[in-house]
A protein has these predicted regions:
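Hydrophobic/aromatic-rich alpha-helical bundle segments in the mid-to-C-terminal region
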Residues: 141-191, 200-204
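N-terminal intrinsically disordered/low-complexity leader segments
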Residues: 1-12, 76, 201-204
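Amphipathic alpha-helical segments that line or abut small-molecule/effector binding pockets
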Residues: 19, 86-112, 153-157, 187-195
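Helix-turn-helix
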Residues: 12, 16, 20-58, 62
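Amphipathic, non-transmembrane alpha-helical scaffold segments
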Residues: 10, 18, 64, 89, ...
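Amphipathic alpha-helical segments used for helix-helix packing
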Residues: 100-120, 168-173
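Amphipathic alpha-helical packing segments from all-alpha helical-bundle domains
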Residues: 71-72, 98, 119-145, 153-154, ...
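Amphipathic alpha-helical linker/stalk segments
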Residues: 63-92, 133-142
Length: 204
């Protein structure tokens, strides 16, 4: 019983450290955050951090695993129920947009990993969550449609890349229609992803 209570306290302390580090990383960046600051934010002694994590980088990896939205998004995408690939892509894009609207911290976390770590941790995290990623891709390619024969992982990367381009440029465009900031622009991105930018001969 005592060992169970000790384990529970340890898990609670780890969670407090990760939560405190997350707030500081979002605010100050990785290199702008010290172990001392994390300890103070978590109401712990600095030495206590090292009882749970070997380094600040290990804490950051735990933050990614806990807070990166891709691991909240993938389970929902894999359960999207429609047999039509066009509808699936539209639904998936809208779900991601709605989810990220509630996660304004996403870009901060993403760019810390991309700029300060050169995305070194993402492959490992994707491997760790491979069943979720595989389920999403299988759901993608299993739809009855005339998909061109691209490798499934390439299709998934193209979709996620399209959406990331939309999300980042949305902050640049704002609501300016001249810069493509209209409310329906996500549908335009999805249409380009599905059909490209060239007119078919019978449309020209």
């Amino acid at each position: 019983m005592a060992s169970d209570e000790k384990l529970l306290r340890g898990e609670q302390t780890q969670a407090a450290i990760v939560q405190a580090a997350y707030r500081l990383f979002i605010q100050n960046g990785y290199h702008g955050t010290s172990m001392r600051q994390i300890a103070r934010e978590a109401n712990l002694a600095v030495a206590s951090l090292y009882n749970h994590f070997e380094s600040k980088e290990q804490i950051f990896i735990a933050v990614l695993e806990r807070y990166h939205p891709i691991f909240e998004i993938l389970p929902n995408l894999s359960r999207t129920d429609t047999s039509d690939v066009s509808e699936f892509v539209h639904r998936a894009a809208q779900f991601i947009a709605n989810h990220l609207d509630q996660r304004q911290d996403f870009l901060n976390l993403f760019f810390i990993e991309l700029v300060e770590f050169r995305a070194v941790h993402i492959p490992r995290l994707l491997e760790k969550n491979e069943p979720l990623l595989t389920s999403f891709i299988q759901n993608f390619v299993a739809k009855k449609s005339n998909l061109r024969p691209f490798p499934p992982f390439v299709l998934a990367r193209a979709f996620l890349g399209m959406f990331f381009a939309y999300y980042v440029t949305r902050f640049i465009a704002g609501n300016n229609p001249t810069l493509g900031g209209e409310a329906h622009v996500l549908d335009d991105f999805v249409d380009i992803f599905l059909h490209g930018i060239l007119l078919e001969e019978n449309e020209a």
